[in-house]
Amino acid sequence: VTTERYIPAKRAFRFLSPSVTTSTSIKLNWQENEGTTAGLGTHITGVDGATNGFDTTATNNPSLYTFNNTSGAWEAVTSTLTNFTAGTPYRLMVRGDRLINLSTNTPTATETVLRATGTLKTGNFSPTLNQAAGGFSFVGNPYQAPVNIKTVLDAATYMNTGVVYYWDPTLNARGGYVTLDLTNNNTNVTSNFNQYLQPGQAVFVKKANTPSAASVTITESHKSVANGAAGVFRTTSPNDYGLLRVNLQANTNNQWQTIEGSLALFNDNFSWNVTSEDATKMSNLDEEVSFVQNNTSLAIACVSLPSVTSELPIQLNNLRHSNYQWQFELANYQGERPYLYDTQNNTYTEITNGATVPFTATTAAANRFKIVFQPSALNADDFTHGLVLYPNPAKAGDSFYVQGSTAAEVTVYNVLGQHIPVQVKSQGNALQVTPTQTLSQGIYLVTVRTEVKTQHIKWIV
């Protein structure tokens, strides 16, 4: 049987898995035995070039990898003179078909079809797994049919049944990880992937946080031919969760395109502690966005409804451009108003569905941004920049100063929305504000009103 896997035109990594066991080599199959028919096969490069079956380049850098589930590390394939075994997952840099010019790093990508001829896999398939608590394992679809990865994990032993990690080649420059929450079919960044693993596709799964031995067995009953169409994105029980998706966008060909993102789901059944319901972040090749909770980077953070003391710090790494923007998706959300806090510029922007916030990359980008929350009862205007409150944090009994205006109305509220009386005096180019009652330790909300703007600042005592 000859199987075919269509690959759209883009120079990017793909997570692939043959559904046949071959009696011929990788070279004779995916490399078309060095054939040069348009739209068929691809170049595969590696150490010592043609000696090991690879296509020769000036550097012979590897483009085909396997993942050692035992050690948890990528390993370059050392030869394409070996045969395929159905269900073996690979990471392959697909440049295009075999007419691509290997002498340049920027050839025009072309679509292609990867073919493999052999015996179809039937019966059970049990991959070797990473047995470390919380360890990741690379698993391929062994069948020439869609597989419901949710039912696979539900039947597994000591595996995290709520999350799976795809590689989406359409994201960013070379592709990026998409984290799929299997309990509600939400992804950290908008993507067409769903719970149905396509023929020829591979994914990462995660072991539960336990030392007990895990096992996964993919069976014929996990095939899902009727429901396996790719490109379907569904959300089940949408009213059960408040959703906040943070998308990082870059300007490509004069269009803003989402290249990375993270997702927060809000429900009082969740916790602000990191639990098995959260999805940890896998490292990307290019830009990387995650929420940070308890020193853990999360692609999907499942948290209870926030209070005014709640924060979702954003970690931002591997920036390749100068200019970006945040784009937000907010749905079914009820609770304290979310704001994007820029710690570098000391600005707050209310997060609404579809809102965008441009920014320029700096060396402080890694922990520059966070999501904070303010009481809905205050009916706050958007935060604006230009005023600075200090000291912040402050000690109980201290005054604070508002720099940037000497003619403003200053009011203070506690987190319950109760007014705190204050005395306000002009001190040079600042206002000295002194509460007239003893304050308890906690969060207070300072409102500064001028003729042209209103600013709300969180003050910590």
Model-derived regions: residue spans:
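C-terminal tail/sorting-segment detector
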Residues: 439-461
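Acidic, glycine-rich segments characteristic of secretory precursors and extracytoplasmic regions
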Residues: 1-69
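Short, intrinsically disordered, charge-balanced linker/junction segments flanking boundaries
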Residues: 56-58, 74-78, 453, 458-461
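Serine/threonine-rich, low-complexity intrinsically disordered segments
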Residues: 44-47, 386, 449, 456
